[in-house]
């Protein structure tokens, strides 16, 4: 008993590592992209408008398909005490955005930590330690864990579901699986379904017992999402059912681009897992890892059949594959036939390579949110007592602008699209894309208050450290009206 307590105490710094790394990512890249918009705006509206649903953003900008409010409701509930205190202290709403994202990040890290505990039980302390170090040094897992993407909200539920599966707590596994599949991401039926089929094949669970939990879980979760989301959307809807029909049956997701069949395997997984990918085959020396590999790789293989692909779509597999990589690291560390320095150098070196890749990616990503930077500059450059009517164009709205950044209650912020040239002159300020020719249209009526740069990529430069340059160009311009329209 004393040994277990001592081991638990020694593991707490690893939790601190995960939280610290996630916080660094959050602070360096505090703004968001359009993919995160619905959940972020919905959480804002739940916090600040509460039952005044007419003021909610999704009524004006509903998006291509409806999304569920289940995730924003949970995030808002946990964020509300801190946000309330910040509002009493009259602190900028921008910091509420950080709190909201931080709460989501803690939810994901809590799932990682619970999974780590089970890894410690089944594979030993060394594998658990390596799992934490690998997870903390991978860019995409830490970068995305605070981002209000539907996939990340689902990840916060998938992690405890997978932990329950490893613990053979079948009832909890089925209930969590039903909740995340029906409420958040229907494609997770492939990942969690393969895990369930594997369990049935191994005769650890009977079909009758599965149905005894799956039927009430499915009905209850479906009823919950339909009831909650129909209230907020004001019509009868099962959001994830609509998304499933749109993306899978109609294959409309292809409108946002397509990738080759094996893209997840040769591009997404290497970028997501970093140098740790090389240790996964070594982890396969332990037959216990086969049960981890089959659902994860099977999910990626099946999901590859859909033409539209993004790395975040398979982020659920990263922690599971990290367990295999951690087992591979442990295999090397325990290989007595090799000199200890060689073993330690291989394992430590791959962690350092991950850190270098993460630091580079995070630095470049910092320049990817010109819309958020523009909103910050607007509030710094324009006195708060000024009468401001700001128009925000699509490019700005997609690269960092959110309701949390609308910090002046006396100003008016407008994201209306297809506004005519004459009507644009009614705005005191215009935040627009720096497309050649567009700012020139306002040369006689506006002045450039600020130009905001964004990244166009990186280029190799061996003459400096770090050996690359971030290529920047003006992405947005902030215009201020000179004269009032006649």
Curated annotation (Swiss-Prot):
EC nos: 2.4.1.260
Any one of the GO BP annotations: dolichol-linked oligosaccharide biosynthetic process
Membrane topology reported for the UniProt record: Multi-pass membrane protein
Record's keyword annotation contains Transferase: yes
Pfam families xrefs: Glyco_transf_22
Pathway entry: Protein modification; protein glycosylation
Cellular component GO terms held in the UniProt record: endoplasmic reticulum membrane
Bilayer-crossing regions: 12-32, 69-89, 94-114, 123-143, 146-166, 178-198, 213-233, 265-285, 291-311, 313-333, 344-364
Top enzyme class: transferase
One term of GO molecular function: dolichyl-P-Man:Man(7)GlcNAc(2)-PP-dolichol alpha-1,6-mannosyltransferase
InterPro entries: GPI_mannosylTrfase (IPR005599)
Subcellular location, principal: endoplasmic reticulum
Reactions listed under catalytic activity: an alpha-D-Man-(1->2)-alpha-D-Man-(1->2)-alpha-D-Man-(1->3)-[alpha-D-Man-(1->2)-alpha-D-Man-(1->3)-alpha-D-Man-(1->6)]-beta-D-Man-(1->4)-beta-D-GlcNAc-(1->4)-alpha-D-GlcNAc-diphospho-di-trans,poly-cis-dolichol + a di-trans,poly-cis-dolichyl beta-D-mannosyl phosphate = an alpha-D-Man-(1->2)-alpha-D-Man-(1->2)-alpha-D-Man-(1->3)-[alpha-D-Man-(1->2)-alpha-D-Man-(1->3)-[alpha-D-Man-(1->6)]-alpha-D-Man-(1->6)]-beta-D-Man-(1->4)-beta-D-GlcNAc-(1->4)-alpha-D-GlcNAc-diphospho-di-trans,poly-cis-dolichol + a di-trans,poly-cis-dolichyl phosphate + H(+)
Keywords assigned: Endoplasmic reticulum, Glycosyltransferase, Membrane, Transferase, Transmembrane, Transmembrane helix
Function description: Mannosyltransferase that operates in the biosynthetic pathway of dolichol-linked oligosaccharides, the glycan precursors employed in protein asparagine (N)-glycosylation. The assembly of dolichol-linked oligosaccharides begins on the cytosolic side of the endoplasmic reticulum membrane and finishes in its lumen. The sequential addition of sugars to dolichol pyrophosphate produces dolichol-linked oligosaccharides containing fourteen sugars, including two GlcNAcs, nine mannoses and three glucoses.
Family (UniProt): Belongs to the glycosyltransferase 22 family.
Protein's name in the database: Dol-P-Man:Man(7)GlcNAc(2)-PP-Dol alpha-1,6-mannosyltransferase
Originating organism: Mus musculus
């Amino acid at each position: 008993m004393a040994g277990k307590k001592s081991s638990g105490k020694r593991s707490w710094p690893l939790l601190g590592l995960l939280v610290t790394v996630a916080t660094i990512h959050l602070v360096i890249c505090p703004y968001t992209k359009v993919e995160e918009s619905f959940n972020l705006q919905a959480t804002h509206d739940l916090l600040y408008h509460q039952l005044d649903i007419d003021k909610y953003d999704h009524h004006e900008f509903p998006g291509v398909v409806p999304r569920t409010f289940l995730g924003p409701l949970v995030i808002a509930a946990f964020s509300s005490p801190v946000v309330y205190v910040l509002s009493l202290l009259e602190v900028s709403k921008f910091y509420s955005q950080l709190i909201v994202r931080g709460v989501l990040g803690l939810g994901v890290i809590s799932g990682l930590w619970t999974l780590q505990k089970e890894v410690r039980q089944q594979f030993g302390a060394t594998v658990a330690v390596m799992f934490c170090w690998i997870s903390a040094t991978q860019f995409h897992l830490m970068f995305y864990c605070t981002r209000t993407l539907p996939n990340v909200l689902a990840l916060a539920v998938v992690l405890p579901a997978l932990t329950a599966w490893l613990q053979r707590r079948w009832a909890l596994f089925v209930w969590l699986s039903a909740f995340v599949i029906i409420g958040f991401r229907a494609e997770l039926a492939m990942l969690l379904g393969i895990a369930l089929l594997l369990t049935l094949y191994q005769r650890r669970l009977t079909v009758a017992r599965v149905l005894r939990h799956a039927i009430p879980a499915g009905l209850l979760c479906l009823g919950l999402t339909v009831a909650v989301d129909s209230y907020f959307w004001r019509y009868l809807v099962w959001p994830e059912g609509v998304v499933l029909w749109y993306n899978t049956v109609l294959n409309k997701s292809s409108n946002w681009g397509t990738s080759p069949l094996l893209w997840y395997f040769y591009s997404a997984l290497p970028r997501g897992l970093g140098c740790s990918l090389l240790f996964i085959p070594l982890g396969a020396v332990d037959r216990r890892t086969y049960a981890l590999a089959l659902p994860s790789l099977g999910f990626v293989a099946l999901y590859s059949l859909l033409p539209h692909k993004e790395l975040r779509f398979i982020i659920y597999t990263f922690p599971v594959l990290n367990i295999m990589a951690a087992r591979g690291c442990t295999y090397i560390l325990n290989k007595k036939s090799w000199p200890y320095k060689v073993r330690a150098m291989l394992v430590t070196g791959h962690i350092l390579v991950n850190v270098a890749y993460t630091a580079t990616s995070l630095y470049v990503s910092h320049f990817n949110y010109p819309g958020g930077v523009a909103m910050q500059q607007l509030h710094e450059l324009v006195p708060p007592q000024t009468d401001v009517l700001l128009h925000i164009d699509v490019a700005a709205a997609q690269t960092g602008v959110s309701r949390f950044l609308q910090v002046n209650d006396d100003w008016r912020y407008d994201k209306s699209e297809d506004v005519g040239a004459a009507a644009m002159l009614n705005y005191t300020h215009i935040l627009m894309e720096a497309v050649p020719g567009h700012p020139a249209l306002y040369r006689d009526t506006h002045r450039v208050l600020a130009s905001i740069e964004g990244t166009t990529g990186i280029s190799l430069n061996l003459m400096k450290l770090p050996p690359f340059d971030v290529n920047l160009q003006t992405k947005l311009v902030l215009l201020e009206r000179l004269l009032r329209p006649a």
